[in-house]
Amino acid sequence: MRALVLAAGKGTRMKSKIPKVLHPLSGKPMIEWVVETAGKVAQKVGVVLGFEAELVRKTLPEWVDVFVQEEQLGTAHAVMCAKDFIEPGDDVLILYGDVPLISENTLKRMIEEHRKGADVTILVADLEDPSGYGRVIQDGDKYRIIEDADLPEELKSVTTINTGFYVFSGDFLLRALPEIKNENAKGEYYLTDAVNFAEKVRVVKTDDLLEITGVNTRKTLVWLEEQLRMRKIEELLENGVTILDPATTYIHYSVEIGMDTVIHPMTFIEGKSRVGENCEIGPMTRIVDCEIGNNVKITRSECFKSVIEDDVSVGPFARLREGTILKKSSKIGNFVEIKKSTIGEGTKAQHLSYIGDAFVGKNVNIGAGTITCNYDGKKKNPTFIEDGAFIGSNSSLVAPVRIGEGALIGAGSVITEDVPPYSLGLGRAMQVVKEGWVLKKRKEE
């Protein structure tokens, strides 16, 4: 089985300089949805590109065969541009880059039906308002497809529509393509004409209108996003996740969340994030591509491409940037930013700190206002803080630097050299007290 994805259109009605198939749906480009599904049912996948072909090509896996349709002259013309992809002894599944939610199950049903001896198998659906769609007309055991623009008045009441998804026998398709003409209202080469040439046609019906919805406008894309969002929320609710306000909760379809986790309002969980069991997330929190363990609490914070182990507390108003690893039972408090750093088990950074390019051990206390000065103007340098160290408030650790196990850094210090284990590090000016100075100064004035 081969799958050919037609994705050459510009998408004029999207009013965008970005190719239509690259517009994201629930966090990933529409074409990525289709290619992933195609790869589950077909041994080889090809894609026909057109507008901004090189830009789209960069998003595709290396195992996808790419063909280019220089001029968009219809669906059959797009398939002709990939003629070398079609093998006489193999079947070909036709998909579309702007119809992202076609399901693996439906495609498998089509393939199974097709293998009963068909030249072509069509996916159809019944719509209350079929206007704009080609109709599937049955005449005994024969089927033909008439495009909406070419439909005679007496057939406009037919509600069975052609979704555009087909499985073709490779032998039949190679014979049919040269016979297709552009003698129609739009002057294009329709793949539906190949169906009309077929002697052995089989039909599979879908009742899920989401999976056959094509995206031609931003309005449709937003509608599809909302339908997919609510479908995901319903799935999570059925599997033991509490979502306090579905209307203000945005969770990408690829996200996984464990049972007994509570999601508060205004929470965004995106990408390939995985959240464990018995967590509390939000309110007003954004999580992107994170691995989160069990019993984790994240409040009013942003976490991006980070790993958070069990029993960790984050926030409020913390920011975890890419490469952050929070070990078990660590605590990150308000207005703390962490980047490319590992925070050890039981370590606390509760207030107003920046930790970048650092390796922090177990049970370390990071005092309020601690800064790792990692950038020297040319490169980022590492800071090492070993187990049990205590960093006093308002300290600056000028990297590269190492704070030894159990060492103590006095509040207000600027540390530029390594501090040995169990040592006191001080780096501040000596305090001067002048008794009565204020009164004396006032008399002079």
From Swiss-Prot:
Q: How is the cofactor bound?
A: Binds 1 Mg(2+) ion per subunit.
Q: Which residues bind Mg(2+)?
A: D98, N216
The entry's localization annotation reads: Cytoplasm
Show the active-site residues. Answer: H351
Q: Does the keyword Repeat apply?
A: yes
Reactions this protein catalyses: alpha-D-glucosamine 1-phosphate + acetyl-CoA = N-acetyl-alpha-D-glucosamine 1-phosphate + CoA + H(+); N-acetyl-alpha-D-glucosamine 1-phosphate + UTP + H(+) = UDP-N-acetyl-alpha-D-glucosamine + diphosphate
On the tree of life, the source organism's domain of life is Bacteria
What SUPFAM superfamilies does the record tag this protein with?
Answer: Nucleotide-diphospho-sugar transferases (SSF53448), Trimeric LpxA-like enzymes (SSF51161)
Which residues are recorded as binding acetyl-CoA? A368, N374, Y375, S393, A411, R428
Q: Which cofactor does it need?
A: Mg(2+)
- Broadest EC class assigned to this enzyme: transferase
Task: Indicate which residues the UniProt annotation says bind UDP-N-acetyl-alpha-D-glucosamine.
Answer: 6-9, 20, 69, 74-75, 96-98, 134, 147, 162, 216, 321, 339, 354, 365
Molecular function, one GO term: glucosamine-1-phosphate N-acetyltransferase activity
Choose one Gene Ontology CC annotation of this protein and give it: cytoplasm
Location of the region described as Linker in the Swiss-Prot/TrEMBL record: 219-239
* Matching InterPro entries: Bifunctional_GlmU, GlmU-like, GlmU_C_LbH, Hexapep, Hexapep_transf_CS, MobA-like_NTP_Trfase, Nucleotide-diphossugar_trans, Trimer_LpxA-like_sf
UniProt entry tagged with the keyword Magnesium? yes
Pfam families referenced in this protein's UniProt entry, alphabetically = Hexapep, NTP_transf_3
Q: Please list where the region (N-acetyltransferase) is annotated.
A: 240-445
Say which family it is in: In the N-terminal section; belongs to the N-acetylglucosamine-1-phosphate uridyltransferase family.
Q: This chain belongs to which protein, by name?
A: Bifunctional protein GlmU
